[in-house]
Amino acid sequence: MHKDQEKPIKLLLTWAGSDKWYLLASVFCAFLSGLFVIGPYVGIYHLMDAVLLGTLTRKGLTDCIVLVSVTTVFRMVLLGLSGVLSHKGAYNALFRVRCMIIEKLAKVPLGYVSERSTGEIKTVLNENIEKLELCLAHNIPELVSYLTGPVVIFLYLMTVNIPLALISLIPLLLDIPVMMAVFQKMSALLPETNESLADFNSVMVEYVRGMRLIKAYRMGSKSFKKFREAILDENRAWNKIAKKTAPLYAVFILLLESGLLLLVPLGGRLFLHGSIPASVFLLFSYIGSLYLTELLPLQQLSGNFAQAFSGMNKVKEILALPTFEGGDAFPESHDIRLKGVRFSYDGKINVLENANLSIRDGEKIAVVGA
């Protein structure tokens, strides 16, 4: 498969090299951490059930406390271990990617570097690659952890009552199109944001270099029009993202937390008709309406993934540049000959055409333009 056609996650692991094993170990720890999410839910459910039925004993209370405490401790320990492993692998991978870009820039034609501002290249090396750290060290392990917990709880609910368990999934099914819409909007708006950030970095470098003149003439930031406009453009870009995605985020939260509106009426009806006992009704009223809230951070992750993939595209653009291949033997003759050279500033009108020039070894020639 061509490198440009590789899936983003696979490409990130390819760039990580041998450090990908830290990232995979981090994902495994995050998966184990997600398995322990069910502990507190089950423990508190058994405690509430025992209190309502009047069967609570000291041993039952102790068992619930131990279950909640042990599963919570194990979850936090595994989550912390996942974070350590992911950061170790992520920062090593970022170092490797930055080295790849620097080595690439050292071999590309000089025209590429001269045609791009310092701020644009700085944006790729700093901001765009830094977004990859957020993806590798946080988003991927968190995605696994956030998905594992609800899946385990859903499987547990399926063993209790299949119809009510399936009903509890309705809010999630309604939310999937919302999440996809947010990801698409972020992906469409991020190129504009990256462009404004690159312009901002370019103007910032120029502003810092001219700081002595600004102080000498007692000029403020408002008098430096390009600097002010760059700040406003960056602000406008992020305000646009907020206005486009905020309504969808509100819809996402409302739908995800609407399980109670479905489970309580339907579960209550089944309970009144004797189809389910009170403990099952309590279980779905408590756990069935809450376990999907574990997926709330996924909405933020969709935006983070969009930013990371946008940064990856910038990195891929540089890595895909053609390189200047040397390796030929040094010529014995040091003469310089230009034959039939033409040049145009705009690509349409030639300002230099059919120019021929011969400079012998050791000869000095000055070219003066009119």
Predicted features by range, described:
Residues 219, 243, 291-318:
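Cytosolic ends of transmembrane helices, especially the final helix of ABC transmembrane type-1 domains
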Residues 18, 22-33, 64, 68, ...:
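Transmembrane helices of ABC transporter permease
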Residues 13-21, 110-111, 127-136, 140, ...:
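An intracellular "coupling" helix at the cytosolic face of ABC transporter transmembrane type-1 domains
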Residues 36-45, 71-114, 118, 122, ...:
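Juxtamembrane helix-loop junctions of ABC transporter transmembrane domains
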Residues 1-37, 53-64, 82-86, 90, ...:
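Membrane-integrated ABC transporters
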Residues 23-78, 159-163, 278:
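Transmembrane helix-loop-helix hairpins at lipid-water interfaces of multipass membrane proteins
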Residues 332-370:
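ABC-type nucleotide-binding domain
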